[in-house]
Each structure stands twice: as structure tokens, then as C-alpha cells.
Amino acid sequence: MSKPTGSTSGCLDILNVKSSRILDIPCKVCGDRSSGKHYGVYACDGCSGFFKRSIRRNRIYLCKSGSQGGCPVDKTHRNQCRACRLKKCLEVNMNKDAVQHERGPRTSTIRKQVALYFRGHKEVNGSSTHFPGSSLPGPPFFTTVTQLEPHNLEMSSVATTPERQAIVGLAQPTPKYPHEVSGTPMYLYEVATESVCESAARLLFMSIKWAKSVPAFSTLPLSDQLILLEDAWRELFVLGIAQWAIPVDSTTLLAVSGLNSENMEAQRMNKIMAEIQALQEVVTRFRQMRLDATEFACLKCIVTFKAVPTQGSAELRAFRNASAIAALQDEAQLTLNSYIHTRYPTQPCRFGKLLLLLPALRSVSPSTIEEVFFKKNIGNVPITRLLSDMYKSSDI
């Protein structure tokens, strides 16, 4: 498979991490296996990346325990206290000047946004790149959920067609936060620009992985798959924010984006502020409904399988198999309706309320989401281009 040219070439490189990069020499900071010398010492990718970000952004951390260097810094505990981790980096003689004189990140590096995902999982699980949903299609949802919930849900009666079975099978229990992987809890969810940026990158990545995990989706023509994904990514992203409780307060988001009245014209700034408020409102409405994993999975299918694209020219974006797409959306709605009647029999209006919430997912423009969550890291590269390149990669 030929690699894309230009600024997208790095995207596939990040996805093709070779085990030969992992050495038997331990990381001087945490003791994990190093991937070579970084800033003068042998270090793992996690610690070298942490050191680079800390120095480049002039981070000042406070020790969580107040011991000023007494917190353990090893493979298991390295994420618990950033102050002690940075102190350990300096103690083992990581070179700050090497970071400052290093060539800065290029705005064309799409791979940085993808790397955020992998770095986050290395931080939690060592070198593992597994994340929720990677084993899909797995056991049917009704089998999994009966082992976790006190209610015995007869979901087998809902999944009466292959399409519905595929949709129901998507609703594997998912972590509360993108940082929480394979049962390993995130130590503290810190409302910091780094946390939000990495979470946004993971949401984008998992939207792609999720789409490729849907059997009915992958049977559509590739051109239809790409149109659907490019059209629905905004709604999938907002649903992910609601599902995983990512902070959307204006102070945090403006810090994430680096936007302010000094570097942006007033009219554009006012539009972004209005859309941040709209994002807060729609996320609040979804969280008030307290959706479970199955409902989120069905809603993702409903917003993805739109037979008429909501973005762009209909002439330029005509589907090759619009009837199949429409049928899949019908199946997703029927599945959600049947599930709600089974799971929430005392809430007869719940299905209608959830459907009425879906248009609100489009109250935030794709351009604002790109500007706030991604532009600082990937520059002017369109998200749709990133989505297309990543989706076509055989490594995902």
C-alpha cells in the first residue's frame, strides 16, 4: 500500500511502531524499557515525551503529596506525580538545552495528533496500543452486559437481523474516560490543556477504529464509507465528549486552543465563544439523560448512517448505495427503540427524547471544533484529510 504524499506521510509512520525500537536497556527515569537515547540518557518514549513537553512549555508542577521528590517514579506510578517525574528526569541528567535547541514541531505533522493517542496508551499500559473496541466484533452485547448489570436484559430478542446484531455488538462496555484502558484506572483526571488535547485526539482516533469495526459499515463501497465518516465525525466527537466527561468549560477550551482577543478578530472570537456555549449546552443535555453504553453505540450508528450528507454538495458527494445506508439507519433506530423499551420500561418517552437531541450535535461547526481542539497541534491540515488517510491505513 503506497503511503500518502506531502504532510500526511508521517501519519502511517506513527501507526507502524516497530518492536525493534524497544531496547533491553532500562529507562533511567522509570525503569521501563528504553527506546534509545533521548536528551542524553536512555529513556522510554513516555518519559522522553513528558520531559520534552514539560521543558518546551515551561511547565511548573506541584508535588501531589507535598514531599518534593519523594513520590515513586516507576513504570507503574510514573503518571501519579508530574513534579517528581520531572525532578527525576533532571536528576538523571536529561539535557534541557537539547530540548530548547531541538527543531520545533512542524505545523504539517499530522502524525502528532495520532501520536497523542499512542503516547497516552504507552503511559498507561507500557508499550501496548490496545484500546476499547479493538477486539470488535466481540461477544454480543447482551451476553457481555448480563455479566455486568443486575438486570437480565433479553437483548437477543432485539437483535433479529444481522445488521441489528452488528449494531448491538458494538455496545461493549467502555471506560468512563479515554485515559482508562483495559481496566487500568486513570489516576487523576486533571483539567489541563494536555489532558484535553490528548483526549480529543483519542476520540478522533477511536471514531475511526469504531467505524472500521462495524461489519455493516465496512461492506459499503469505500467512497460511501469515507463520505459517511467525514460527514459524521463532528457528531461522533461531540457524543464522545458527552460520554467521557471531557471538560468543555470556556476557560479550559480557550487555553487548549490558545485563542484570545489579541490573536483573533472580534467577530470570529464571538462566533467561537457562542459555539463553545452551544457545545456546553448539548453536552449537558446528554449527560442529564445518563445514557448507557448501548444507547451511545446506537446513537453513533444513527448519526453515521445518514443517506443524505449534511455537509458539502450533494452532486459531488453522491452515495453509491444510499438505499443500504438508509436501511442501516432504520435498523439502528429500531434497535435503540427496542433496547430502551426493554431496559427502561418506565421511561416511554426516552427514545423520542434521545432522537430529538441529535440535531443539537450539529450546533457546533466542524471549523470551530478543529480550531479549538486540533489546530494548535496539526496546523491547517483539514480534519477530513486526516480522517481519510487514517481510515485507509491497513494498520488501524
UniProtKB/Swiss-Prot annotation:
Localization: Nucleus
Zn finger intervals (NR C4-type): 27-47, 63-89
UniProt keyword annotations, A-Z: Developmental protein, DNA-binding, Metal-binding, Nucleus, Receptor, Transcription, Transcription regulation, Zinc, Zinc-finger
GO biological process: cell differentiation; negative regulation of transcription by RNA polymerase II
Gene3D superfamilies in alphabetical order: Erythroid Transcription Factor GATA-1, subunit A, Retinoid X Receptor
NR LBD domain: residues covered: 153-394
Assembly notes: Monomer.
Similarity comment: family membership: Belongs to the nuclear hormone receptor family. NR2 subfamily.
Role according to the record: Orphan receptor that binds DNA as a monomer to hormone response elements (HRE) containing an extended core motif half-site sequence 5'-AAGGTCA-3' in which the 5' flanking nucleotides participate in determining receptor specificity. May be involved in the regulation of early eye development.
Protein name: Nuclear receptor subfamily 2 group E member 1
Gene field: nr2e1
